[in-house]
C-alpha cells in the first residue's frame, strides 16, 4: 500500500502548550511537550518508520475555543495558523494543515477559514468542541455550533468545500457534576466522547444538513460512540406517541451516513472498526493516530495487521482521505 494518511495529529504553539498538561501524568509531561512542539524531527522519523506519508496537523485542545476574549482568540488562531503554514511549507509532501478558528465570533471564524484555505493552502478546519465568549455570560455558557448565529459560518464552510473536524474537549465545570469525584472519567476515557457525540447530534437535529447538504463533518475515535447508538436514537424518536420534536427533516442515520466521516484516532480495536464498517461503510472511515497523545507505532502496527480486507485497508489508510481532502490533485 502507498503511504498512509493520518489526520488527527496535533501540535502546539507556546501559547497553547499548557492546555495539554492535564491529560498526562506529570512524569510524562516533558516528553509530551517535546512531541507537541516538534514537527520536523521525531514526528517525521516515526512517520517514515511506519509508512505514514502525510499528516494533516491541527492545534492542541481546547486552545482557541477556551479563550473567551474575542481579540485574543482571533490573535491566537491566526498565530497558530501562520506557524502551521510555515511548517507545512518546509515539507508540503508530508504535512498539510487544519485551520484553528475563533468561533467566539462566527464572522471572524469564517474570515480566518477563508484565509487559511485560499492563502495558506489548508485543507479544512479542526475545532476543539464548543467555544466560550466573554460576551455570552462572561464565557460561562458553552456555544454549540447548531445555534442560529453560526448558520452564516456554515454557509461559508460549504462554499469553500472543505471538511470540518469536530474534535473533543471537556465540559465546563458546571456541566460536569456527574464526574465529581471521578476524574478518571474526564478527558479521553469518557467525557470527550459524550461531549462530542451530543454536539454532533445537535448539529444533525438542527436542520443544518437540510440547509447545507454539502457539509462534511469528521469525528475521531471511531465516531465518539454514535455508530453503536444510531438505530436506538432513531427508533425511540419514531416509536413514542409524541416524538421529541427537532427541526431536521430526516433520521439521524441519514445525516450520519451522508454528512459524516469517522477516523480511527486513539481507538485501536479491530472489533470496533468492524462494527463501524458495518454501520457506516468503508468509504467513510479514515486512519488516524492521535499523536502525540497516542503512539504512532501502536496505531500503525494495529491498523496494518487488522483483520479487514486489503481493499478496505487501502481505502481507510489512504484513498478516502486523499479524496476527501483532495490531496492527490
From Swiss-Prot:
Domain of life of the native organism: Bacteria
GO CC list: cytosol
A biological process term (GO) from this entry: secondary metabolic process
Keyword Metal-binding attached: yes
Swiss-Prot/TrEMBL induction comment: Induced in the presence of gamma-resorcylate.
Cofactor: record remark: Binds 1 Zn(2+) ion per subunit.
Pathway: Aromatic compound metabolism
Keywords recorded for this protein, A-Z: Decarboxylase, Lyase, Metal-binding, Zinc
Reactions listed under catalytic activity: 2,6-dihydroxybenzoate + H(+) = resorcinol + CO2
E.C. designation(s): 4.1.1.103
Xref: InterPro entries: ACMSD, Amidohydro-rel, Metal_Hydrolase
Pfam families referenced in this protein's UniProt entry, alphabetically: Amidohydro_2
Cleaved signal peptide residues: none
Gene Ontology molecular function terms on file: carboxy-lyase activity; hydrolase activity; metal ion binding
Names of the cofactor(s): Zn(2+)
Residues engaged in binding Zn(2+): 8, 10, 167, 290
Residues annotated as the enzyme's active site: 290
Phenotype of gene-disrupted mutants: The mutant is unable to grow on gamma-resorcylate as a sole energy and carbon source.
SUPFAM superfamilies (UniProt xref): Metallo-dependent hydrolases
Physiological role: Involved in the gamma-resorcylate (2,6-dihydroxybenzoate) catabolism. Catalyzes the reversible decarboxylation of gamma-resorcylate to resorcinol.
PANTHER family listed in its UniProt record: 2-AMINO-3-CARBOXYLMUCONATE-6-SEMIALDEHYDE DECARBOXYLASE (PTHR21240), AMIDOHYDROLASE-RELATED DOMAIN-CONTAINING PROTEIN-RELATED (PTHR21240:SF30)
Record's protein name: Gamma-resorcylate decarboxylase
Lineage, highest ranks first: Bacteria, Bacillati, Actinomycetota, Actinomycetes, Mycobacteriales
Primary gene name: tsdA
Amino acid at each position: 500500500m502507498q503511504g498512509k494518511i493520518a489526520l488527527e495529529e496535533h501540535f502546539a504553539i507556546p501559547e497553547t502548550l499548557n492546555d495539554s498538561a492535564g491529560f498526562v501524568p506529570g512524569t510524562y509531561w516533558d516528553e509530551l511537550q517535546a512531541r507537541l512542539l516538534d514537527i520536523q524531527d521525531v514526528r517525521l522519523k516515526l512517520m517514515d518508520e511506519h509508512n505514514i506519508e502525510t499528516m494533516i496537523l491541527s492545534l492542541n485542545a481546547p486552545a482557541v475555543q477556551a479563550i473567551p476574549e474575542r481579540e485574543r482568540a482571533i490573535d491566537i488562531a491566526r498565530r497558530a495558523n501562520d506557524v502551521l503554514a510555515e511548517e507545512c511549507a518546509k515539507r508540503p509532501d508530508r504535512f498539510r494543515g487544519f485551520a484553528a478558528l475563533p468561533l467566539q465570533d462566527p464572522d471572524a471564524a469564517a474570515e480566518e477559514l477563508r484565509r487559511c484555505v485560499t492563502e495558506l493552502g489548508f485543507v479544512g478546519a479542526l475545532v476543539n468542541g464548543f467555544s466560550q465568549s466573554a460576551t455570552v455570560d462572561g464565557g460561562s455558557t458553552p456555544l454549540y455550533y447548531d445555534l442560529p448565529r453560526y448558520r452564516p459560518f456554515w454557509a461559508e464552510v460549504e462554499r469553500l468545500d472543505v471538511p470540518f473536524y469536530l474534535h473533543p474537549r471537556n465540559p465546563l465545570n458546571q456541566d460536569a457534576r456527574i464526574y465529581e469525584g471521578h476524574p478518571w472519567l474526564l478527558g479521553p476515557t469518557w467525557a470527550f466522547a459524550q461531549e462530542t457525540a451530543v454536539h454532533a447530534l445537535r448539529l444533525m437535529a438542527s436542520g443544518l444538513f437540510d440547509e447545507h447538504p454539502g457539509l462534511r463533518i469528521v469525528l475521531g475515535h471511531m465516531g465518539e460512540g454514535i455508530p453503536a447508538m444510531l438505530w436506538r436514537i432513531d427508533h425511540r424518536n419514531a416509536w413514542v406517541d409524541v416524538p421529541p420534536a427537532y427541526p431536521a427533516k430526516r433520521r439521524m442515520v441519514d445525516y450520519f451516513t451522508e454528512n459524516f466521516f469517522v477516523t480511527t484516532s486513539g481507538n485501536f480495536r479491530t472489533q470496533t472498526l468492524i462494527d463501524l464498517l458495518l454501520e457506516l461503510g468503508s468509504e467513510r472511515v479514515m486512519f488516524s493516530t492521535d499523536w502525540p497523545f497516542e503512539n504512532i507505532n501502536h496505531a500503525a502496527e494495529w491498523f496494518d495487521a487488522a483483520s479487514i480486507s486489503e481493499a478496505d485497508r487501502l481505502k481507510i489508510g489512504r484513498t478516502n482521505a486523499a479524496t476527501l481532502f483532495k490531496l492527490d490533485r
